[in-house]
Every structure is written in C-alpha cells, then in structure tokens.
UniProtKB/Swiss-Prot annotation:
Pfam families membership: HGTP_anticodon, tRNA-synt_His
SUPFAM superfamilies per the UniProt record, alphabetical: Class II aaRS ABD-related, Class II aaRS and biotin synthetases
Entry superkingdom: Bacteria
Entry protein name: Histidine--tRNA ligase
GO BP annotation list: histidyl-tRNA aminoacylation
InterPro entries from the UniProt entry: aa-tRNA-synth_II, aa-tRNA-synth_II/BPL/LPL, Anticodon-bd, Anticodon-bd_dom_sf, His-tRNA-ligase, HisRS-like_core, HisRS/HisZ, HisRS_anticodon
Gene3D superfamilies in alphabetical order: Anticodon-binding domain, Bira Bifunctional Protein, Domain 2
Length: 433
C-alpha cells in the first residue's frame, strides 16, 4: 500500500526551510508593530457570499478559482482566496469602527485558489497583508507602500520596482469600462479566449493578459489616466508627490488594474524580475467601496498583501537566511550522563542559549561528527566519569580548545559563557568574510 502524497498545488514546508518563513514573519511583525498595526486572525473559511459580494462575481477569482463546498447545514462555504474581505467582515461584525479614527490591522496565513501550480504559485499559498481602514487621505496610501518597502528592503531585497496607477472612483471606472469595450470590440476575434470572455464581464482584466497578440492590442487601448475625474487626478498627484518626498522611486503603469473588483484610486505592485513570469511580490491599493458593499457605512480603506512563497524564492536566491544553528551541542553517553544532559540543556535554554541535545545514543565519535555538522560554537561532553563527578567537558569546536568544570560552575558562569560564544561567533564570521 503506497504512501499518501500531498495534493497538487500544496507542499510541505520542511524544517530546513522554515527559518526563512520565521525570518519574514519576525521582520514584518517588528516593522508593522512600530507603525501601530495590530494583528488580526480571521477564520480560514467564510460564507461564500462574502467573497461574491466583496471580490466581485465577475472576477476570475470568484468565477473560476475558489474552493467552495456545502457543509452539513447546507451552507455554502469557501476557503478564503484572499485576506481583505475577511478582515473587513471582522471589522464590521466586531464594531472595530466604534472607537473612531482609523484601524491599522495586519494578518498572516494561508489562502486558497484553484490555479495551475508553478514556481511561486500554489493552490494553498501564504500572504502577509495589512489594511488601513477609515481614511481617504493620500498619506495612507503612501504609508502602506512605505511599510511594504521597509519590510522587503530589511529582508535584503533591493532590486524591486514599484508600479503605480489610479483606477479612479466608481464613475471613472464605469466610463473607462465603456471606452475599453468600444475599443476591444473590433478586435474580439483576435483576443485570447479568456479576454473574449472578459470583454463584457470585466474588460479591465484584459489589460492584464499575458497573451502575445492581446498584449499587442493593449498597447493602443485607452488609458485609465485619461478618464480620471478631477478628484481622482488630485488624489493620484498627491500620492506621487508624497512618494517623491519619501525618496521612493516609482513607475506609472496605466495597464495596472489588479484582479479584484473592489479597488479604487491607487493601485500598486512591487515587482522583481528574478521571479520570471510570477514577478509580483506585493500588490495592493485603495478600496473605498468595500466596507459599504459588505453592509457598513461608506468607509475608505487601503491595503496590500505580500506573497510569501514568491518572497522566499527571492530570499533563497540571495541566500539571506537567519542563523538557525545552535550555540551549544550536548553529547552524552550512558544512562546517568544522558539524564544530566537533558537537565543541563533545559537550564541553559532558560538562560537564553540555543541548545541541541543529541539523543541518538550512539558512540561519542558519531555524536562529535554531528556536533561539527550542526554549526554549533561549543560542545558539552558528558560521559560516565563526568556524570559521576557532576562535571562537564566544554569543547570549542573551531579551536578544539577544551576545559573541564563542574556543572554548577557552568550554570553560574552562563553570562561569561555567552560572552565567550559571542567572541567565537565574531571570529568565525570574520574568518568566512
């Protein structure tokens, strides 16, 4: 009987990779916390109507990509395909607006879409996202862009391109939709199949087509920027000026429309050419009509989401990985020594040291080889003699220096030990540069 495998479009995140994920989450948490964004954790599945109303029934996400099922109460439920709709639902259901002012929220977790799996695109994928709800001020648009930039640059990504556009307000978009339909109709037979389907349903998405002939037709399509009203133009001009004031470089891309119906005014993407076809690492924009669409009062908002799988592909290319090696590796042999090793490991961990305890029970020679491979700075050795005398041998793995001490001395000198570990780390780092 064969082993059970993961489903297409899903994958295990294994221990050797998890350090990247924890690194990204830690950096994002630190930066967003400093900007007074609070984490929120909505459910992974919601009523299907939330996404039909929030994302738009005419979108590819709702029409083709959602994982939808009926539960035993015959309710239609959907695994969330994105995070914003659930956050807005939570904002309304839990009266987060009652405090007044703006709400700064962020989330992290898995999303689900039925797509063709490829590098950087999975059917279960993960996002870090934020939402700034309650203000139409262009400074909010720029604040969230600046925070995404800070996160990505702190992680070591420097060669990113920021594309921005304005998709205007509802009236602007309606006028633009009509202009697009009139432009594309004579070319209908030349458009790819998906774009033909989108022509009446969601013509803005034709601008995002990857088909070669459709892209050629798009080159002469009307620009959304030519259909913006005065208020939309003013908002977009202010966003550009504020980005310039912050020293954030950007490129205006009139074809940038994003894939969800709720976007208004500013839309943006952060792009890396290192990812091939799946180039967008972060995408977002303003969605001033979504709160009202989901039953609330008219409330402006802006947000983004970072795709973690794509981001981690980039981090691996940069070899930008956190240090996941132990400070100390404990080897022991014999029942009494192994028990004392466990106790020492726990006590040293409580003092803030990273400790790996060898539990193989194999000969010292094999344990020492594993200690060398672990990347640890020092090794604590416990044999039968050490167990009897309540002593240890502390061995520095790079210099091979070794010193004997009692277990009590080891624990009382943890501060000195940490200083010694730091010195050895600096020596090792210097020798590898």
């Amino acid at each position: 009987m064969g082993t059970i495998q993961t489903l297409p479009g899903t994958r295990d995140i294994l221990p050797e990779e998890i350090g990247y994920w924890q690194y990204v989450e830690t950096v994002a948490t630190q930066i967003l916390s400093r900007a007074m964004y609070y984490e929120i954790r909505p459910p992974i599945f919601e009523q299907t109507s939330l996404f039909e109303r929030g994302i738009g029934e005419a979108t590819d996400v709702v029409g083709k990509e959602m994982y939808t099922f009926s539960d035993r109460g015959d309710r239609s439920l959907t695994l969330r395909p994105e995070g914003t709709a659930g956050v807005v639902r939570a904002y309304l259901q839990n009266n987060l607006y009652a405090a007044g002012g703006v709400q700064r929220l962020w989330y992290c977790g898995p999303m689900f879409r039925y797509e063709r799996p490829q590098a950087g695109r999975q059917r279960q994928f993960h996002q870090i996202g934020l939402e700034l709800i309650g203000t139409a001020d262009p400074r909010a648009d720029v604040e969230v862009i600046a925070l995404a930039t800070d996160i990505l640059k702190t992680l070591g990504l420097q060669s990113l391109k920021l594309d921005i556009n304005s998709v205007g307000d509802r009236n602007d978009r309606q006028n633009y939709r009509e202009a697009l339909v009139n432009y594309f109709l004579p070319y209908k037979a030349e458009l790819d199949t998906d774009s033909q389907d989108r022509l009446q349903r969601n013509p803005l998405r034709i601008l995002d087509s990857k088909d070669k002939r459709t892209k050629e037709i798009n080159q002469n399509a009307p620009s959304i920027l030519e259909h913006l009203g005065d208020a939309s133009k003013k908002h977009f001009d202010q966003v550009q000026q504020l980005l310039t004031d912050l020293g954030i470089e950007y490129n205006i891309n009139p074809c940038l429309v994003r894939g969800l119906d709720y976007y208004t005014h500013t839309a943006f993407e952060m792009i890396s050419d290192d990812l091939g076809a799946q180039a967008t690492v972060c995408g977002g924009g303003r969605y001033d009509g979504l709160v009202e669409e989901l039953g609330g009062n008219p409330t402006p908002a802006v947000g983004w989401a970072i795709g973690m799988e794509r981001l981690i592909i980039l981090l691996k290319q940069l070899q930008s990985s956190p240090d996941m090696t132990p400070d100390i590796y404990i080897v022991s042999r014999g029942e009494a020594a192994e028990g004392q090793g466990l106790i020492l490991a726990q006590k040293l961990r409580k003092e803030g040291l990273t400790v790996e305890l060898d539990m193989s029970g194999s000969a010292f020679g094999k344990q020492f080889k594993r200690a060398d491979r672990s990347g640890a700075i020092a090794c604590i050795v416990l044999g039968e003699e050490e167990a009897t005398n309540k002593t240890v041998q502390l061995k520095w793995l790079q210099s091979k220096e070794q010193q004997a001490m009692t277990q009590a001395e080891l624990l009382t000198k943890v501060g000195e030990l940490i200083e010694q570990l730091d010195r050895h780390k600096r020596t090792m780092n210097h020798s590898t540069q």
